[in-house]
């Protein structure tokens, strides 16, 4: 494995691996340790005290971050008729039906970041389950991406709506914004995300819900947050 660069090693010295920081301190450090030549993304990784193997302990949803993510999101919408026109007016990047299914299947085309569909188009979208599912792109009612209100869906996504869901190790991974953001913007995005995740706690979850929280920039070290201080 290649050694990390000099800048990374210098950044690492700023972080006390034995310490659990409060959110403001952690995000300040994430900004300081973002030393790459590009504008790194600051991410949150939240381990929950649930078991994703059980249906009644799933944690999944979406939340609009007040300051967005800093990323330009490309939206594909499956809709027809007046709903297709609505999606185009709202600013969707691609709108269609069977022809988009054929393009994805035939050309392995994935030049989009989010897929939205009206409920009546899910039969069409279902044919893409095997390719969209593993990429986390399958529309889902819980995340607001299966809906007839396409104007709201597209506007929220463009404004900074992010999805969160458990991976196999019961961790949620969500972008909080860019390292160039003001510290206050990243903190507000973080608190908005945490609030949504806490509210999504399954009734079947027992014991400590927020097990561990780490923030990091794309190329930077992980900075641990004290899960007992996050909502202070």
From Swiss-Prot:
Keywords: Repressor, Ribonucleoprotein, Ribosomal protein, RNA-binding, rRNA-binding, Translation regulation, tRNA-binding. GO terms for cellular component: large ribosomal subunit. One of its GO terms (molecular function) is tRNA binding. InterPro entries: Ribosom_uL1_bac-type, Ribosomal_uL1, Ribosomal_uL1-like, Ribosomal_uL1/biogenesis, Ribosomal_uL1_3-a/b-sand, Ribosomal_uL1_CS. It holds the Pfam family Ribosomal_L1. The keyword Transport does not apply. GO terms for biological process: regulation of translation; translation. Belongs to the universal ribosomal protein uL1 family. Binds directly to 23S rRNA. The L1 stalk is quite mobile in the ribosome, and is involved in E site tRNA release. Protein L1 is also a translational repressor protein, it controls the translation of the L11 operon by binding to its mRNA. PANTHER family: 54S RIBOSOMAL PROTEIN L1, MITOCHONDRIAL (PTHR36427), LARGE RIBOSOMAL SUBUNIT PROTEIN UL1M (PTHR36427:SF3). NCBIfam families: rplA_bact. Part of the 50S ribosomal subunit. This is Large ribosomal subunit protein uL1. It comes from Alkaliphilus oremlandii (strain OhILAs) (Clostridium oremlandii (strain OhILAs)). The lineage of its organism: Bacteria, Bacillati, Bacillota, Clostridia, Peptostreptococcales.
